[in-house]
Structure formats: structure tokens, C-alpha cells
Amino acid sequence: MYGNQQNNSNPYQMSYYRMNNGQGQGTNRWPQQLSHQEMLAGHSQQILNNNKPAGNQSKPPIVMASNNVFSIGPYRQRKDSSRISVLQKYEIIGYIAAGTYGKVYKAKARDYQNGMNRDNVIILDSPDSVSADSNLDINSINRSTRQQEANDNLTTMDFRKPSHKRFTPPNNSNSTQIRSNSGSETNVRINSSSITNNSRKPSQIQFYAIKKFKTEREGVEHYTGISQSACREMSLCRELDNNHLTKLVEIFLEKKSIYMVSEFAEHDLLQIIHFHSHPEKRLIPPRMLKSIMWQILDGVSYLHQNWILHRDLKPANIMVTVDGCVKIGDLGLARKFNNMVQTLYTGDKVIVTIWYRAPELILGARHYTPAIDLWAVGCIFAELIGLRPIFKGEEAKMESKKSVLFQANQFQKILEVMGSPDHKIWPNIDSYPEYLQLAKMPKYRDNLTAWYQTAGGKDKTALDILYRLLQYDPIKRIDAIDALDHVYFTNGDPPVCENVFEGLNYKYPPRRIHTNDNDITNVGNDNNQANHSQKQPMHGNNNNKNGNMNGLGVNKRILAAAAAAAAAAAVSGNGNNPTSNTATGGSARKKRK
């Protein structure tokens, strides 16, 4: 069968092979007698023979590089030496705050060279940067049936396309109808100066927020993988694209640390509430209050329509830009909930800050719904009205992570305002694990109306939507789509504004930045220092005068304590050799047993 085939371009179809072992005359064998390795060797030898030039001067065959070139050590060194430091691209202005999972800094972009190698940077400015195998199953994102019936022309959110600009100023009017994620129309007043943060003039300085995720031990470089919170936040922020969610710009992987660069917001609701409550109480204007709530619910609606729970909504996580655009931030506790059979309780026994935690969570619910976010939104709404948390309880600290204590004091604060629930208000209340604890508590009547009037509230529609957001039964609690359709937002008195600061005759103070904090040690103030660090391999830079390990700096006292502990351990373990690991910033440490 092989003798009849004349195609000699493929060596596997040649009628006859001549194998040359390089040590003399080759051996003639039929293809049936050749192994796969011999066929490949014969093919390679034939290619080398065909590439030899005519004449006696033949070039030696190409020799493969040694295995050392492709080993992980030299490869990692080359990659580390060519990577871009976060300090090379951004100038750190100051330290903002620290949370459970990381520290946040304010920064601005440096004069950056486009020709630099950017292997350690994940650019997210364009939708093309989103990979096809993203963590979010885009095909599984469906809208509810009632939303499709409400607006057949509104298509499903596509993460790979930039968000649609819903706010389009008309030619000759200052008010228009805008369409929310739910498909409902709302009267909104448009200000020509209220274009969002992405449309700044080129002459204006663009600021960024850089979040550095905490490591297991500060000042110690180690490979222990990426935390669950960091994975969730990075994967979700890469996919989500909504005007009322903070936008992720890029991600840096540097010195075994992760840095998330996001758009910067000058204010947050906690700061605004503090401004209105100190030194004397001044209520938030009704139009500003309504506009803030509409934009929060629009962002929450977008998350829930895409099967995502935020699980940590509170005033400190609601940002407001200088243009008056409200943005939901900090998705460290967010997660998908499309699999309703799987419990959401495992591994996340404590979620949502205690003052904004829904009653079903306090009662030990294993399977919870997006209603927990709407309860938190109701608590935020009440705090914006009264300028203090409506349910300000004391959290009982857990002695063990294996069990979650019943937060009796927090639930009592809820009962004092909302009254005691019964089976008529909450039919399946007795099915929760901690129901017996609730049954032992004193009985209270509903005092929300009295609380609202005492806080200075006058709008009855605002009180009605507050009642619906703070329903005990999560099944009866209003969802984000219906909340956007509530008469409180649709009556147009006052109208919802894209710029929540519109009409104010005062300005809120900028966010407080700590420029003399020990943790940043004046990082980013010297451009020459950043350019010099660009030329030095990052893995060998242990003599940094500012002690800037792990990218954005480590407290010198921590390094000194670590060095002292290492010296003490060396003295106790080696007797006469106390200088094995000292004074080098902890670059050489003993392995943990």
C-alpha cells in the first residue's frame, strides 16, 4: 500500500525510510517497522540535510540551549528585572485607609513611557482585555421575565461592551426621562457640568485609588497563593461595567503582592454623613438624598441582575466622585449566587457589617438571597435621613470561627424600631436556627414612623419605601428593580439628579490623606528614585533607603522587630553565630518548620 503513494512531502507517507544514526551507514527499514520516535528523528534529520548549503562549507547543526536557560530560576529573574513597578507608573500622594483585606492609597499617574515591558500589568481599560474564560459565566446571565415584559428593547447586559451612557442631556431642556437597569423611566434633572468622572478635561489631573492586598505577615515575602477575597474582587471587577460601580483600571503583581488600581472618588457617604452631623445637625437636602438612593439602587440592581451579591453595603463603601456620581465600591465580600442549591454559608460565616446585617443573617440563615443587600440599602437610607445608624448595636465577639454567636444586642436594636415579628409578618420565622433565642427576647411594637418623624423626615413616599426595604421577611422585602419603580423616585418632586451635588451652595471637604504615615514613608515623591529603581532588578533591591519592600512600603518598626527576632533566634539556636540573618531588611530568613 505504501509503494503506490508518490507524495514525498510527508515523511510518514514515504514508501521507504533510510535512517542515519550519525555514526556511519544508515539502516533501511519499512515504515511499519519504525517507532514513532524514529519517525520524528528521521523527519528532523531530513530537514537538516535539506537546509545544508551546496559545497564543502556546511554550517554546524543548530544546538539547543542548555536546560539551565529554561529553568524557573533564570526565567523568574529575567521577568522580575523587566517588570514595571507600581511606583514607576504611579506617584503615591498619600495613605487613605486600611480595611480588613488591604490598604488603600491615593495616587496620580507619572509620565509613563509607552515602550516599557508591561508583563506584570493587566490592563482593563478596554473591553478587549476581558478574557473569554472569565470567572463569570456570561451565558448564564439572564434577566427576569418581568424585566423583559417591561422593556423588550432593553438587551441583556454584555460585560464585554462598555456601559451605555444613560444620561444624555436634551438640546433645549434641563430635565429628561432616564431609563434604569430595570427598564423603568424616572424624571431626572441633568446638569451640563455633571458629566461623569471618565470625561475629565485632559488638563485636569486624574487621580487613582491603589489597593494593596494584605499579606499573611507584613514585611515577609512568601508564595502562599492569592486570598479568596482578592480573587473574588479582581475577577468581578474585571467583568462588571456600570456607571455606579467603581471601575478597575489595572492590576499589578509585584514582589508577591497584588495592587488594584481603580478610579478615585473624593468622597464617600460616611464622610458626607459626618459633615452634616458635626458640629451641628444639618439634614441632607431632599433632592440630594433621593438622587443618592436612586444611584445606589441602580448599582445594586445591576449587580443582582448579573447574579452577584455585594454582602458588605455600608456608607463607607459608597463612593461619590467630585462630579456627584455615586459608585458602589469594595467587592471583597461579593460573590455569585446563581447556584441556589449550594449554601452560601460555608466559608463565609460572618458577612455584612453588624449594623447593616439583615435579620435572617442574625438568625443563622444558610441560604440567603439578594434581599440581604436591600436590607443594608434600607439601613443606609435611614442613616442618611437621621445622620446616625438606625440599628447601632454592639457586636458580640466570636471566640471560635467554628460557630457564630447570636447577636442579641443587634437584634434588640432592630426590635426597638421595627417591632417584634410574628408569624403573620414573617410566616417561616420559626425555621431559622436561632429562632429560640429570638423568642426569649422582650416584645416591642413598631416605632419606625415615630423614628422617621423624630429624625426630621416629612416625605410619606420616602417612609413607605423605607418600610419596604426594612421588611422582616426577605420574601416580602422589595427588590432593587421594584424600588427603582417606586413612586418616591417617579413622582419628580424633587427630581432625581445625575449630579447629587447639584443646587448646593456649599462644598464637601476632600478626603483626608495621610502623607506622613510611617507605612508609606514618602513613597512616590521622587521621580528620580522611581527611574533608578526601574534599572535595578526588583528581586535584588534590598538596600532601599526608605524600606519600600512589597511595593508601597513596610513599617520600619516591623522590619526592626523581625530582624531582632531573627537575631535572637540565631543566638539561641546557634550559640556563637548571632549574625546569620541581620540588618538586611529580612532578605534571608530561615524556613519555617
Swiss-Prot record:
Q: Which organism is it from?
A: Kluyveromyces lactis (strain ATCC 8585 / CBS 2359 / DSM 70799 / NBRC 1267 / NRRL Y-1140 / WM37)
Residues in the active site?
312
This protein's source sits in the domain of life called: Eukaryota
Here the segments flagged for biased composition (Low complexity) are 186-199, 540-551
* Role noted for this protein: Component of the SRB8-11 complex. The SRB8-11 complex is a regulatory module of the Mediator complex which is itself involved in regulation of basal and activated RNA polymerase II-dependent transcription. The SRB8-11 complex may be involved in the transcriptional repression of a subset of genes regulated by Mediator. It may inhibit the association of the Mediator complex with RNA polymerase II to form the holoenzyme complex. The SRB8-11 complex phosphorylates the C-terminal domain (CTD) of the largest subunit of RNA polymerase II.
Q: Identify the main location.
A: nucleus
Q: How does this chain assemble?
A: Component of the SRB8-11 complex, a regulatory module of the Mediator complex.
- What's the catalysed reaction? L-seryl-[protein] + ATP = O-phospho-L-seryl-[protein] + ADP + H(+); L-threonyl-[protein] + ATP = O-phospho-L-threonyl-[protein] + ADP + H(+); [DNA-directed RNA polymerase] + ATP = phospho-[DNA-directed RNA polymerase] + ADP + H(+)
User: Can you say what this protein is called?
Assistant: Serine/threonine-protein kinase SSN3
**Where are the compositionally biased (Polar residues) regions?**
169-185, 518-536, 573-585
Q: Please tell me whether the keyword Phosphoprotein is annotated for this protein.
A: no
Q: Which residues bind ATP?
A: 96-104, 211
The lineage is: Eukaryota, Fungi, Dikarya, Ascomycota, Saccharomycotina
Could you tell me the gene encoding this protein? SSN3
